[in-house]
Amino acid sequence: MKCLVCCSYASSRNFGALSCSACKMFFTRATKNYAKFTCKYDKKCFESFTILPKCQFCRFKKCLEIGMRFSEPKQQLFNLNNSVDQDLIILLGNLAVKDGVHYSNFLNFYSLEDPSMDDILADRSRMKLMKRTLEIKTKSHEWTFLGSYYKIAQFLDFDFVKTMSLADRKILFSYNTLRMGSLSRSMRTYLDKRDCLMTPSGDDLFSPAVRGLFDKTPEIINRILCQVVGRLMEIKITYEEYLLLIMIVFCNPSISHELSDSARETLSKYQNMYASFLFRFCQLKNQHKAPTRFNDILSICNVNNKNVEDYCFVHMMFQCMVPEFKFKKLVNDIIIRS
């Protein structure tokens, strides 16, 4: 039997997929260093090869694509003092894998569909996705649409979200999609060692037409592009802290009085759980500074909320001044309801 990652001999399944010992060891190490990998080429190093590529980004991406999933603490990132610490390591590994899968899909697939928020929540399969090629050029507003879709898809996969009614999920994603997108984009920018947001293709997040409307007041554009990233840089947030923070942001039970009692109860339960894990993570890094570190991380929420308000203002101003420009329905939905 052949390893589904590197095509060498494989005798067993590791992390849920047929793989060799070398790829098993690589995946174990990669769950700690996932956020540091980059590809120097077009992120297709493992699609066709005769000599095993050295690209760690594409090797890890291939591991995810064949179904490898982190399910137990094979490697101790910290000194594990009790079962809570083991649960934390497992949780972080699974959150990282989920984040990695959806980010890889975001980069490698696109769609010409124009679904609304209601369409996606009712039936995600109506979003017809196509493999991205080098010839495909994606504009900034299209990246916003795709990023919003993949954030919704990522969080719809959580079991506790699946138990919610369609009405509750609509409220939850209407409020959270932009906030999660803002935080996620800023974190990727920070990990790429840049201080300003841009699209994955390296273009300006705002078109010249948008910038032209704010040529006399560019401060709001600069805030949107740099403010959250700047705060992440200031506190030197880690990828693990980000993974827990974005879950705390998502599981906010006080976003609307229209949420059902059961939805609020579920969100409160999970928000408390993720907050407890984040505080424990801070304790593992530095016992004495844990309360301060915990508060520093949570303070990002205020900056992120302000960033979303600025973005909505710019979007609505552009729609008023250039009404003939048609954004995707999903983008309009999340702007109006945020």
UniProtKB/Swiss-Prot annotation:
Alphabetical UniProt keywords: DNA-binding, Metal-binding, Nucleus, Receptor, Transcription, Transcription regulation, Zinc, Zinc-finger
Gene3D superfamilies linked to this entry: Erythroid Transcription Factor GATA-1, subunit A, Retinoid X Receptor
UniProt-listed InterPro entries: NHR-like_dom_sf, Nucl_hrmn_rcpt_lig-bd, Znf_hrmn_rcpt, Znf_NHR/GATA
One annotated GO molecular function: DNA-binding transcription factor activity
Annotated coiled-coil segments of the chain: none
All residue ranges annotated as the NR LBD domain in the record: 98-337
Subcellular location: Nucleus
One Pfam family of this chain: Hormone_recep
Similarity annotation: Belongs to the nuclear hormone receptor family.
Name of protein: Nuclear hormone receptor family member nhr-52
Taxon lineage: Eukaryota, Metazoa, Ecdysozoa, Nematoda, Chromadorea
Name of the coding gene: nhr-52
